[in-house]
Amino acid sequence: MHTTHIILVNLEYAELNQESEIIHYAENATDVFQHDAFDWRTVQDVIIGSNKPDELLNLLEQCLDTQQQQITQYLKVLNNNLGDSLYQIVSTLSNDNTFTLEFNELAKLLAGEYTFESGFFDIEYCTSRIDKDILQAVKEAPENYALVLFDYHN
């Protein structure tokens, strides 16, 4: 199985200028996730905010939308099958682990744990969770950011 992962690099924070430096930095920062997020990977593209600010913002907004859709989907499954309170959900899961996977995946998304399913990683904040604050910072100064797109295989 393979999927595209988008790695956000703050160029000011890392003091990077060349595309090759950006790729190397993104690889080094995510190497620790080998076997959790990927078995092997290849670079697909590098999008530098000063060159393509609209594309950079568009990809980040797509990541945010995807994450929100995933969270909503897991919540619907849990709500429809286990109830609408955390107490009900945990009580039911204690006796019947049928929906433990969905609960676990939801928790990983909310906690920003980087996995194969995440699709996104922010190196500066060491999180797979993209939120409106990160998006706003990139909107205000896209020239300070780059995205490295990897084809992850698992």
State each model region's role.
Residues M1-D39, N144-N154:
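Short, extreme N-terminal segment that most often corresponds to the first beta-strand
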